[in-house]
Design a protein with these regions (language model features):
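Acidic donor-binding loop of glycosyltransferase active sites
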Residues: 261-277, 290
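Nucleotide-activated donor-binding/catalytic signature segment of Leloir-type glycosyltransferases, i.e.
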Residues: 236-260
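An aromatic- and histidine-rich active-site surface loop
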Residues: 66-67, 83-103, 277
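Conserved donor-binding/catalytic core segment of Leloir-type glycosyltransferases
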Residues: 183-203, 209-212
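A conserved mid-protein helix/loop that constitutes part of the nucleotide-sugar donor-binding site
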Residues: 16-21, 200-214, 283
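Membrane-proximal helix-turn-helix segments that form the acceptor-binding/catalytic region
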Residues: 72-73, 99, 121-139
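A short, active-site helix/loop in glycosyltransferases that binds the activated sugar's phosphate group
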Residues: 134-159, 166-168
Length: 368
C-alpha cells in the first residue's frame, strides 16, 4: 500500500525531524511504500508544496491556493491509497483536512486539535467540530488535551494513541555551518539554559524572562540563557530583561547544525509553556539527554510522572513567573548534584509499550 504523509508546514518549522521519525515507524508495516508530501527540496525533484510562508502576502496567498489545488488533484488521483495528514489546528488546516478526507483511507495526525492562539474563537472551533464530526474518520492522538477536544467535537471515529515519536538522526555538528551568533551564544563556564523553537505567548517566553528577572544575584552569576528561534508575534518584547547580559537572543531560523550545537552544549532546556498538546522541543531535549525545566501543565506533568529523572517540574501556582523562578533557582543550586536520565527511565522511554501497541493497531488498520 502507498502511504502519503502530508506536511504543508515542512521547512517553515523544521518538520523533517518528525517526518523522518514517523517514516521509521511506518517502515515496520509490511508492504508499505511511504512518501512525504512537503515543501522540502530534493535534488532533481520539484517540491510537492510551495513554501506558502515565504515572500509578500500575494505570493503567500497564491502558494496557499496552489497547494490546495495540487493536493486535491493528487488525493483524487490516488484516493485508493492511504493519506496521513499532519494538522496543527490552524484555519488553513480546514480545507487541507477536508481534501484529505476525500480518500477513504485517511488518518489525521493531530499536533493540535485547534491552534493555541485561536482556541477561544467559537466560530473556528465550530468549523473544526463540524469537520471532525462529519468528515474525519480516523485520527492519531498524542495527548489527553487532544482527547478532550475530540470529545468536545463529538468525534466518534478511530483514535490511535501514541506518544510523540522519538527522534533518530545524527548528532554530529558541522561547525562551519554554525553562525557566529550561535557559536557566541554558549558560555562554557556558565550553566547554559536553552529556550528553543518558535517563540510565542503560549510557550511562555515572557514567563521565562520574568523568572530570570526575579532570580537573586548569586544565581544570575551562574547562568546564561539562550533564546533561539523565530518570533512571529513579538512575544519576546512583552517583558524586558532586568539584566540583558544574562541573555543571548537569536531571532531567526536555526539550521540543523546550529540545533545540534545548541542542544549539545546546553545544560538544561526551559519549557515555561502555558499549554501544549505535545512538544517536539521536549522530545529533542530527551534525544540529546538534556533535562527539562518545565511549567506545571498536564502534558509535562504526565511525561515527568512517567520519566521523573528526565527533568524538573515547577509547582502548580497561579503566579507562573514566581513559580518558575523558584524552580530555576533550586535547579541551579543543585546543578551537578542532581542526577538525570537514570537507566530504568531511559530504557522505559526507548521501549515504550504505547509505541509497540500503536504499530500493531496502525498495521491492522492499514490492512483492513
Amino acid at each position: 500500500m502507498n502511504i502519503y504523509i502530508v506536511d504543508y508546514l515542512g521547512i517553515h518549522c523544521g518538520m523533517h525531524y518528525y517526518n523522518d521519525a514517523f517514516v521509521k515507524v511506518l517502515h515496520d508495516i509490511p508492504d508499505a511504500e511511504i512518501r512525504v508530501l512537503s515543501n522540502y527540496e530534493e535534488t532533481g525533484k520539484r517540491t510537492f508544496f510551495c513554501n506558502q510562508y515565504r515572500g509578500c502576502i500575494f505570493r503567500k496567498l497564491g502558494c496557499l491556493i496552489m497547494n490546495y489545488l495540487r493536493l486535491i488533484r493528487f488525493v483524487w488521483l490516488h484516493r485508493a491509497d492511504c493519506f496521513i495528514y499532519l494538522t496543527y489546528g490552524n484555519k488553513i488546516d480546514l480545507p487541507f483536512m477536508w481534501i484529505v478526507s476525500l480518500a477513504p483511507k485517511h488518518l489525521i495526525d493531530i499536533h493540535e486539535a485547534i491552534a493555541q492562539n485561536i482556541d477561544g474563537n467559537k466560530r473556528i472551533k465550530q468549523a473544526f467540530r463540524n469537520l471532525y464530526e462529519c468528515r474525519i474518520r480516523n485520527v492519531i492522538v498524542h495527548s489527553d488535551r487532544t482527547d478532550r477536544f475530540l470529545d468536545e467535537y463529538n468525534f466518534a471515529g478511530l483514535r490511535l494513541k501514541v506518544p510523540h515519536f522519538r527522534y533518530q538522526f545524527g548528532k554530529n555538528c558541522r561547525t562551519p555551518e554554525v553562525g557566529k551568533d550561535v557559536l557566541g551564544a554558549i558560555i562554557a563556564e556558565k550553566i547554559n539554559i536553552l529556550f528553543f523553537g518558535n517563540i510565542n505567548i503560549s510557550k511562555g517566553i515572557d514567563i521565562l524572562i520574568d523568572a530570570v528577572n526575579k532570580l537573586n544575584s548569586d544565581i544570575c552569576q551562574e547562568i546564561n540563557v539562550v533564546i533561539a528561534g523565530k518570533d512571529f508575534d513579538h512575544a519576546i518584547d512583552r517583558v524586558k530583561p532586568r539584566d540583558s547580559s544574562l541573555f543571548h537572543v537569536i531571532l531567526r531560523h536555526i539550521n540543523d547544525d546550529e540545533l545540534v550545537f545548541l542542544y549539545t552544549k546546553c545544560s538544561y532546556v526551559a519549557l515555561p509553556y502555558r499549554k501544549t498538546s505535545q512538544s517536539g522541543i521536549l522530545e529533542m531535549a530527551f534525544y540529546f539527554r538534556k533535562p527539562i525545566i518545565a511549567s506545571h501543565i498536564p502534558y509535562f506533568e504526565q511525561v515527568l510522572t512517567k520519566f521523573p529523572s528526565f527533568g524538573v517540574l515547577a509547582d502548580n501556582e497561579s503566579d507562573a513567573g514566581n513559580c518558575f523562578a523558584r524552580t530555576l533557582s533550586a535547579t541551579i543550586e543543585r546543578h551537578g548534584i542532581t542526577s538525570f536520565f537514570d537507566d530504568d527511565d531511559w530504557n522505559n522511554y526507548v521501549h515504550r509499550e504505547e509505541m509497540e501497541r500503536f504499530r500493531t493497531e496502525l498495521s491492522a488498520w492499514m490492512h483492513e
